[in-house]
């Protein structure tokens, strides 16, 4: 191959966005007759096996130690509702992100297909809304309000992904404030829902908003700083590849070399992503992220023990 041909290949390899199939560890084949393996709610039940049925039980028990004995029907309803909302949001998120893996296993849509997985998520959410309205109508306003907040936050995130930096606030302080508002809606709303359904009041709103912010920070940081998390997802910096705003990315936009981050958000080529990742993993951005994790985690450390997220943040520039 001549010099010209080699130059063309070099340019394409480093500047054209990577096809996502290059990131797969294996080519996955859809399971035949999935209803015979995971039951009627196949994509949903498949994901629930990874997290465990009623995986919010420790939180509910801490919030209301006597609820299981005093009102077992409500106890089950709260746990089932939290499972449905949390897991179905993840099912749709994984489709939106083009994720290959979830918790080290193939994402549900890689097995059952995006149409079935998305429809199952919507169906299960609709089922739980109807069941709540019929069996526990006093919980319906809490559920509807918090679900609206969660989806509003998710919508903000998706609009930013679509519009890129041009649709994001211009100054560093405005960017951070806008990102935090989105997180407090999307992730904070999920934790507030837990408190609202269990206690039927808003006494835990402040603590659970903080817990939601900290939890999202953990996810954001693991995406670019954790080799263990990268192994489970099958790729480093999936958020950046998806042109998604996260706390490290927002900070890196205003760091030295931030133009590379902006370039990667506009066109996630190998060259742009590689250079942007160096900025995101630099000491300055990483130190600010670690400081915010420590600050936000301090007032909710007892709840974090129940959350059990301990991946090491070991990746640096």
Curated annotation (Swiss-Prot):
Enzyme Commission numbers on file: 2.5.1.-
Database matches in Gene3D superfamilies: Farnesyl Diphosphate Synthase
Pfam families: polyprenyl_synt
Residues holding Mg(2+) 1: 93, 97
UniProt entry tagged with the keyword Repressor: no
Family according to the record: Belongs to the FPP/GGPP synthase family.
Function: Prenyl transferase; part of the gene cluster that mediates the biosynthesis of paxalline, a mycotoxin that acts as an inhibitor of mammalian maxi-K channels. PaxG, the geranylgeranyl diphosphate (GGPP) synthase is proposed to catalyze the first step in paxilline biosynthesis. Condensation of indole-3-glycerol phosphate with GGPP by paxC then forms 3-geranylgeranylindole (3-GGI), followed by epoxidation and cyclization of this intermediate (by paxM and paxB) to form paspaline.
Protein name (database record): Prenyl transferase paxC
Species name: Penicillium paxilli
């Amino acid at each position: 191959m001549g010099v010209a041909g080699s130059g063309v290949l070099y340019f394409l390899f480093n500047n054209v966005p990577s096809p996502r199939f290059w990131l797969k560890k294996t080519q996955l084949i859809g399971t035949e007759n999935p209803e015979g393996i995971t039951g009627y709610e196949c994509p949903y039940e498949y994901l629930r096996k990874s997290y465990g049925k009623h995986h919010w039980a420790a939180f509910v028990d801490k919030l209301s130690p006597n609820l299981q004995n005093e009102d077992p029907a409500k106890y089950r309803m709260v746990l089932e509702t939290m499972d449905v909302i949390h897991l179905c949001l993840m099912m749709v998120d994984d489709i939106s992100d083009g994720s290959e893996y979830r918790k080290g296993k193939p994402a549900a849509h890689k097995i059952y297909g995006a149409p079935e997985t998305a429809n199952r998520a919507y169906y299960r959410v609709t089922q739980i809304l109807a069941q709540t309205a019929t069996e526990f109508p006093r919980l319906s306003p809490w559920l509807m309000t918090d679900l609206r907040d969660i989806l509003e936050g998710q919508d903000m995130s998706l609009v930013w992904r679509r519009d890129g930096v041009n649709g994001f606030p211009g100054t560093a302080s405005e960017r951070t404030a806008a990102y935090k508002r989105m997180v407090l809606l999307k992730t904070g709303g999920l934790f507030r829902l837990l408190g609202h359904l269990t206690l039927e009041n808003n006494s835990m709103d402040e603590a659970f908003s903080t817990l939601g912010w900290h939890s999202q920070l953990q996810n954001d940081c693991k995406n670019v700083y954790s080799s263990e998390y990268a192994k489970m997802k099958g790729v480093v910096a999936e958020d950046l590849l998806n042109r998604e705003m996260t706390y490290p990315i927002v900070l890196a936009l205003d760091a030295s070399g931030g133009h590379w981050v902006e370039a990667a958000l506009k066109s996630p080529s190998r060259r742009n992503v590689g250079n942007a990742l160096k900025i995101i993993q630099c000491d300055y951005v990483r130190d600010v992220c670690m400081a915010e994790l420590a600050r936000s985690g301090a007032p909710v450390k007892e709840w974090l023990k129940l959350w059990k997220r301990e991946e090491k943040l070991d990746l640096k520039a």
